[in-house]
Amino acid sequence: MALVRSLLVAKKILSRSAAAVSAPPKGFLAVYVGESQKKRYLVPLSYLNQPSFQALLSKSEEEFGFDHPMGGLTIPCPEDTFINVTSRLH
């Protein structure tokens, strides 16, 4: 009985962590950034109107079209470039 209870608790924890990864908060968009190792970032939807962020999106469109290997929006640039661009948008 204790084993079943432990398994149920573990399942709840895993489902919560999986849901947290897959669903960004309202008003945000999840993007995956990096060249070889991808890291997930949450960016405000307001960034979509910014020309510098749109340039990153164009780069993504050129490389991937609408077929993103991570299942989400992937931006193929170095992580430090992404941080540099987005830090100017605050």
From Swiss-Prot:
Which InterPro entries does the record cross-reference, listed alphabetically? SAUR_fam
Sorted keywords for this record are: Auxin signaling pathway, Cell membrane, Developmental protein, Growth regulation, Membrane
Pfam families in the cross-refs:
Auxin_inducible
The Gene Ontology biological process annotation of the record reads: auxin-activated signaling pathway; response to auxin
What is the induction note for this entry? By auxin.
Q: Where in the cell is it found?
A: Cell membrane
GO cellular component annotations, sorted alphabetically? plasma membrane
According to its record, how does it sit in the membrane?
Peripheral membrane protein
Family assignment from sequence similarity: Belongs to the ARG7 family.
Among PANTHER family, the record links this protein to: SAUR-LIKE AUXIN-RESPONSIVE PROTEIN FAMILY-RELATED
Record's function text:
Functions as a positive effector of cell expansion through modulation of auxin transport.
Q: Any idea what this protein is called?
A: Auxin-responsive protein SAUR23
Source organism of this protein record = Arabidopsis thaliana
Lineage here is: Eukaryota, Viridiplantae, Streptophyta, Embryophyta, Tracheophyta
Which gene is the coding source of this polypeptide chain? SAUR23
